From Swiss-Prot:
Name of the protein in question: COMM domain-containing protein 2
UniProt family annotation: Belongs to the COMM domain-containing protein 2 family.
Subunit-level organization: Component of the commander complex consisting of the CCC subcomplex and the retriever subcomplex. Component of the CCC subcomplex.
Domain COMM: 123-191
Lineage: superkingdom: Eukaryota
Function: Scaffold protein in the commander complex that is essential for endosomal recycling of transmembrane cargos; the commander complex is composed of the CCC subcomplex and the retriever subcomplex.
Short name of one Pfam family: COMM_domain
InterPro entries according to UniProt: COMM (IPR017920), Commd2 (IPR037354)
Length: 200
């Protein structure tokens, strides 16, 4: 899989051609700090004075490197895909090597940092059910609909399981089962399996 970079990111990354290996490594470190701790204007100002480059240009370049690293980490790109992503920019082998090394050395940390921003949703653990129906009633001549009582148990991370008590009638339960079956069939398609494989 290849990450499609927009024109702004391509322009910023192409400006790495004119910089030395030491400065590119420094930009990679600043980008990694940006991912972990957020933006630091003082760093940009210091780098601006040291390199004689406008602070907003430095910030834009760091943003582009940050985007490259975070997107590559999100899709867990391998070495070939990483190289193919940068191929349209026509960077030298040395520049690509510095970026690649910085990315692969820190990929696990970047992934852990990015996961903190994702919502922590409950996951299914167990489901128990019981069918309740009234056998007889003198006041009602018509038949009585049975009721399903469901106990859904979910868990979020290492927290204790949470019990959810639900009640439904057979028609709604059948509709729910049909919708879940449809969702399971949808997730088995080639496109969705490809997306899921890249998310993991």
């Amino acid at each position: 899989m290849i990450i499609e970079l927009d024109n702004t990111h391509k322009q910023d990354l192409s400006s790495l051609r004119s910089l030395s290996a030491e400065i590119i490594s420094e930009f990679c470190k600043i980008a990694l700090e940006f991912i972990k701790k957020g933006s630091n204007k003082k760093l940009y100002m210091g780098a601006s004075q040291k390199l004689n480059i406008a602070a907003d240009k430095i910030e834009s370049l760091v943003d582009s490197i940050t985007y490259l690293f975070s997107e590559c980490t999100r899709f867990m790109l391998n070495e070939n895909d990483f190289n193919d992503t940068l191929a349209p920019i026509k960077l030298s082998d040395e520049v690509i090597e510095i970026l690649r090394e910085s990315y692969f050395d820190n990929r696990k940390d970047i992934r852990n940092t990015l996961q903190e921003f994702y919502p922590h949703l409950d996951h299914y653990q167990n489901l128990e059910w019981r069918l309740d129906t009234q056998i007889a009633n003198r006041s009602l001549g018509s038949s009585i609909n049975p009721i399903y009582l469901l106990k859904l148990i979910t868990k979020c991370g290492s927290d204790n399981p949470i019990e959810h008590l639900l009640q439904t009638d057979p028609n709604n339960l059948k509709h729910l089962c049909n919708e879940l079956e449809s969702a399971l069939n949808e997730i088995r398609t080639y496109e969705n399996r490809l997306i899921i494989r890249n998310i993991k």
